[in-house]
């Protein structure tokens, strides 16, 4: 059985707001439960690209059933705060304050989460299962350096990196 998940509010999910992976992780956990209700012996691999990679890592920090065997993230970001901060600087030459602070407060009020809370970096620190980190060196959206930060945050030795030379965002695999 294969399930392909797309981070998208309303039409594929119970979400109203784009959760940048943070809200979406709860939907993924429900899909895992559904798969296991169909086949209790299923072996599950979670894989995501870009925002899907963040969703994968954010899910990895939750209590997942033993049937979830491995996580594969391809060009994910460390946190919502970090990726928005990077984009503000890179694309617009703007500082974090006041825009990012205001946007994070608005997200907390409307969607129930703040941008610093929505952290793949914090979640991978709770992951005991194997994880593969993939990133392209020519990614001009999510900084390549975030892969190393995420890799170093994951405890244990059951982890690996794969660098895709010259690949952009979402083109590593």
Predicted regions and their residues:
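Short beta-strand/loop motif that positions the catalytic acidic residue
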Residues: 126-128, 133-135, 139
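Acidic catalytic loop of the alpha/beta-hydrolase fold
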Residues: 137-142, 169-170
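Short alpha-helix in the alpha/beta-hydrolase fold that links the catalytic acid
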Residues: 120, 129, 143-152
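Short beta-strand immediately N-terminal to the catalytic nucleophile in serine-hydrolase-like folds
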Residues: 46-48, 74, 134
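Hydrolase active-site cap/lid region
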Residues: 58-114
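Catalytic nucleophile-loop/oxyanion-hole region of alpha/beta-hydrolase
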Residues: 9-39, 43
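Gly/Ala-rich beta-loop-alpha elbow adjacent to hydrolase catalytic centers
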Residues: 48-52, 56
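Catalytic histidine neighborhood in serine/cysteine hydrolases
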Residues: 151-172
């Amino acid at each position: 059985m294969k399930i392909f998940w797309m981070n998208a509010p309303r039409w594929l999910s119970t979400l109203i707001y784009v959760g940048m992976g943070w809200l979406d992780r709860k939907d993924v956990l429900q899909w895992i439960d559904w798969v296991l209700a169909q086949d209790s012996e299923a072996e599950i691999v979670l894989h995501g690209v870009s925002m899907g990679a963040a969703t994968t890592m954010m899910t990895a920090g939750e209590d997942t059933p033993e049937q979830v065997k491995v996580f594969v993230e391809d060009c994910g970001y460390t946190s919502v705060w970090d990726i928005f901060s990077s984009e503000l600087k890179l694309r617009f030459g703007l500082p974090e304050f006041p825009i990012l602070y205001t946007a994070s407060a608005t997200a907390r009020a409307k969607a129930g989460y703040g941008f610093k809370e929505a952290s793949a970096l914090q979640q991978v620190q709770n992951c005991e299962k194997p994880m593969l980190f993939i990133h392209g060196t020519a990614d001009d959206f999510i900084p390549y350096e975030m892969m190393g930060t995420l890799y170093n945050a994951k405890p244990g030795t059951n982890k690996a990196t794969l660098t895709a030379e010259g690949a952009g965002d979402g083109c590593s695999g």
